[in-house]
Amino acid sequence: MPYSIMLDAGHGGARDPGAVYNGRREKDDTLKLALGIGEILQNQGIDVEYTRTTDVYETPYEKAMEANEADVDYFVSIHRNSFPTDNQVSGVESLVYDLSGIKYEMAQNINAQLETIGFVNLGVKARPNLVVLKKTKMPAVLVEVGLSLIHI
């Protein structure tokens, strides 16, 4: 039986651009990534839902409740890290509520897969205070993909 996932393009709307680097906004990159990843997953037979498909703002709590109401199997929130200066730091870091269970395995697998295409694996870290990880009922991962200075 196919499973379902909700993809969250981090940030959004006029009030929350996320990280900004030389005019590039995290909210735009995360939306492109979420839509692209969603298309790949749908082509694999996975039921994909999104917290947003346009440039709108929802609070992290609203996103978590949306995922809970949709009764999806998994939740992945996509973000991009930033760095205050030009540098060559790039990688993937995944955040989970705690370092156990399916969510932790998912995060490790996401990082490992991105490592195979050139991302530095910056590890999986527990962030129990993040609302989208704390309030979702299903396994949830927040993925920090690359840096905002790197074009996607």
Predicted feature descriptions by range:
Residues 2-4, 24, 28-150:
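Active-site-proximal helix/loop segments of hydrolytic enzymes
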Residues 3-23:
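Short glycine-rich His-centered loop
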